From Swiss-Prot:
Lineage of the organism: Bacteria, Pseudomonadati, Pseudomonadota, Gammaproteobacteria, Enterobacterales
Source superkingdom: Bacteria
GO biological process: L-cysteine catabolic process to pyruvate
Annotated InterPro entries: Ser_deHydtase-like_asu, UPF0597
Name of protein: UPF0597 protein YhaM
Protein family according to the UniProt entry: Belongs to the UPF0597 family.
Originating species: Escherichia coli (strain 55989 / EAEC)
HAMAP family in UniProt: UPF0597
Amino acid sequence: MFDSTLNPLWQRYILAVQEEVKPALGCTEPISLALAAAVAAAELEGPVERVEAWVSPNLMKNGLGVTVPGTGMVGLPIAAALGALGGNANAGLEVLKDATAQAIADAKALLAAGKVSVKIQEPCNEILFSRAKVWHGEKWACVTIVGGHTNIVHIETHNGVVFTQQACVAEGEQESPLTVLSRTTLAEILKFVNEVPFAAIRFILDSAKLNCALSQEGLSGKWGLHIGATLEKQCERGLLAKDLSSSIVIRTSAASDARMGGATLPAMSNSGSGNQGITATMPVVVVAEHFGADDERLARALMLSHLSAIYIHNQLPRLSALCAATTAAMGAAAGMAWLVDGRYETISMAISSMIGDVSGMICDGASNSCAMKVSTSASAAWKAVLMALDDTAVTGNEGIVAHDVEQSIANLCALASHSMQQTDRQIIEIMASKAR
């Protein structure tokens, strides 16, 4: 817990990070369904014999092409089956961390027997929705998750309703940390990062520990598109310079390679996404190492990166047509700029240049190619920092970038929240037609 003597705003900042920056094993959309299945299985009277599931179009989009850790298989059906047969119902985003070889074999057998189905929920007004219903004979249990990857809103069995989340807020209840964060500014976040006691934010160093381990695993070249390992190999061949810029890209993309390729190591996520957590963490770690930063300086830079990423992503739908590795990299740009320079002006210029650079990148579902987008975003972040250090940036006279960084962020998020909704539908239609 944090120091209760901190001012209330800073306490809410820390709570926001603690809520949004969590370990996650496997891509979080399939994992959300696996969690629903695991919780349902825990309520079922008897072993699971059949699994039915329904998900929102956006969750389907992010579950079609991603490998489920430990299985070597892609997609939502294996996630649902393994969650039901080997999931830890109390582990949240690490629901599959205890899955045994036998559970994986049983899940694959259940799939092969045609006992697992995953469909799009229709109609569905929720961006993030997953429902799993498990059966043992005529007995069943059903769990629904809505709004957040672990936000269970309803549990029901053949005997009746077990749990329903109350929608109303009790009188006098404090606003959520994210609600408070939505009314803050980057300048206030920077003041917090500069002045908060180190002991209150030391926990953020865990993001470096987890994501560095994932990056090291990715450099083995066994996972996903092995972008990080390939680029490292090209450095050895003399086709790519061995410098800070390449190290940022290599180590960041390697973590995403391992993440999307199904490595059985957790990522420290941000805003419900492992890739966002990786993108907000690894560039900052690499730059901190380059400058010999101590733990306190690294923690402050990571806190700025993660909190800025949460602040920006909080203005977006939880899932959208905008690749959120780009917004996480805006947080990384802030953290790297702080390490090198520390000035608000440098940080705001770097974020503005990011918005002018990679804001059009679409999300076409979770897959190994996410590591490509992560590498692009990390590279753009460092480029934006280098420009800002030379007092240059995309200005308010260009495109959607405004003269004020807060308005630039608002403009980007308005595009993703409104105009890009049709883009999202088109992406889902294209992906669904390929899956037939």
